[in-house]
Amino acid sequence: VEFDVVVEIPKGSRNKYEVDHDSGRIRLDRTLFTSTQYPADYGFIEDTLGLDGDPLDALVLLTGEPTFPGCLIRCRAIGMYRMTDEAGGDDKVLCVPTTDPRLEHLRDINHLPSFDRLEIEHFFQVYKDLEPGKSVEGANWVGRSEAEKEVQASRMRHEEQHADDDEQSGQGGKVALGGDQ
């Protein structure tokens, strides 16, 4: 299963950027209160709806330099960090670019060195620690198969939401072209 990830935050940043889905522009949401930094490029999988009501989150492992906010990367999942925060389910799909042969050996979560998994776990366990009202309440790793199932389920939630939006707006899935018809 391949998908596009929109990068919001490059690896090494303490700034938390978010795409404003209405304008398409990138907004600085906040600077992390802790001294931690993002362990991989971080963003979301396009055309998905996660359990938290936002697009499904993704971390992209790269062999070279970090990318930049707004960069689109074609990826495949190798696993997922199932996480619950103060607002509920907040899963993070761990993926690699489909175009990088240096990462071809990473096919499932167990192919990633355990220290790399621990580094990612540590980040998500502490990155909200100093923020009032925010917390991480539980998390565990699952493999590629579970990650791909969640990507598919999130795509279905996204499609259902947009079908409901079309019905409520009277469009019924049709796009008006303008003018007298």
Model-derived regions, located:
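Hydrophobic N-terminal alpha-helices or hydrophobic patches in metabolic proteins across all domains
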Residues: 1-165, 170-180
